[in-house]
């Protein structure tokens, strides 16, 4: 059975949730063993697929789950703002580690390897390709190249201030243009994830709201502090 068919069956059976297991770098949760535990728990809870960063994490997760895994490698480059799977060798390493789908930065920014070359390498290995995009133009370009999935992953992260809400409009526009859209980026509530489906998303990736304890704790702390200040001001 193909990876795409397997993923589609998981979506039909349990829903269209992809869980991104990426701890805050340097946090107490940032170890392959903990990432593997997160991924296993997400799989047991009904996730349709997983998104895993880094070869060590992917190698730790792969023996424990049969779900399709979207693999990425993040790098901080001096010569380019592109961070997600920027090199051909990253694709080779992710394939070797067990990724079924490989995601790469699909934006039109300066980069060490052309998008066409990255996609060709993914296809050479017989894997599915996901383009992490920031705009309609990015998504349509990568769709024309032949990417299997178009993610809204980088919307709001390439310039200016990052908004609080997900980019539902981009999901809708890409879906209307015929893209198989994976909504990603700031989907912090179940209601937002469901809204993405109503806008045409094929699946929804959720990360921080499920697997980043620090972020979730900060959300609660900020809300409680704001209410406490409001109550104090009222007196």
Curated annotation (Swiss-Prot):
<comment type="function">
    <text>Converts N-acetylmannosamine-6-phosphate (ManNAc-6-P) to N-acetylglucosamine-6-phosphate (GlcNAc-6-P).</text>
</comment>
<dbReference type="InterPro" id="IPR011060">
    <property type="entry name" value="RibuloseP-bd_barrel"/>
</dbReference>
<dbReference type="GO" id="GO:0019262">
    <property type="term" value="P:N-acetylneuraminate catabolic process"/>
</dbReference>
<dbReference type="GO" id="GO:0047465">
    <property type="term" value="F:N-acylglucosamine-6-phosphate 2-epimerase activity"/>
</dbReference>
<dbReference type="GO" id="GO:0006053">
    <property type="term" value="P:N-acetylmannosamine catabolic process"/>
</dbReference>
<dbReference type="GO" id="GO:0005975">
    <property type="term" value="P:carbohydrate metabolic process"/>
</dbReference>
<keyword id="KW-0413">Isomerase</keyword>
<comment type="similarity">
    <text>Belongs to the NanE family.</text>
</comment>
<protein>
    <recommendedName>
        <fullName>Putative N-acetylmannosamine-6-phosphate 2-epimerase</fullName>
        <ecNumber>5.1.3.9</ecNumber>
    </recommendedName>
</protein>
<dbReference type="InterPro" id="IPR007260">
    <property type="entry name" value="NanE"/>
</dbReference>
<comment type="pathway">
    <text>Amino-sugar metabolism; N-acetylneuraminate degradation; D-fructose 6-phosphate from N-acetylneuraminate: step 3/5.</text>
</comment>
<dbReference type="Pfam" id="PF04131">
    <property type="entry name" value="NanE"/>
</dbReference>
<dbReference type="GO" id="GO:0005829">
    <property type="term" value="C:cytosol"/>
</dbReference>
<dbReference type="InterPro" id="IPR013785">
    <property type="entry name" value="Aldolase_TIM"/>
</dbReference>
<keyword id="KW-0119">Carbohydrate metabolism</keyword>
């Amino acid at each position: 059975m193909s990876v795409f068919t397997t993923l589609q069956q998981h979506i039909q059976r349990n829903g269209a949730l992809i869980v991104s297991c990426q701890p805050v770098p340097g946090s107490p949760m940032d170890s392959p063993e903990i990432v593997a535990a997160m991924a296993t728990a997400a799989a047991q809870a009904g996730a349709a697929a997983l998104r895993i960063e880094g070869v060590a994490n992917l190698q730790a997760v792969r023996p424990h789950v049969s779900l399709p895994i979207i693999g990425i490698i993040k790098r901080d480059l001096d010569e380019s703002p592109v961070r997600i799977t920027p090199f051909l060798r990253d694709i080779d390493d992710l394939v070797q580690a067990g990724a079924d789908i490989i995601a790469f930065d699909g934006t039109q920014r300066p980069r060490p390897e052309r998008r066409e070359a990255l996609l060709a390498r993914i296809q050479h290995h017989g894997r599915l390709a996901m383009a992490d995009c920031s705009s309609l133009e990015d998504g349509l370009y990568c769709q024309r190249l032949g990417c299997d999935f178009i993610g809204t992953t980088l919307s709001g992260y390439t310039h200016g201030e990052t908004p609080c809400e997900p980019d539902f409009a981009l999901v809708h526009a890409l879906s209307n243009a015929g893209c198989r859209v994976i909504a990603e980026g700031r989907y912090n509530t179940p209601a937002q994830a469901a809204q993405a489906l109503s806008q045409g998303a094929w699946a929804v990736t959720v990360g921080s709201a499920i697997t980043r304890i620090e972020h979730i704790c900060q959300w609660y702390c900020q809300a409680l502090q704001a209410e406490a200040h409001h109550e104090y001001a009222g007196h």
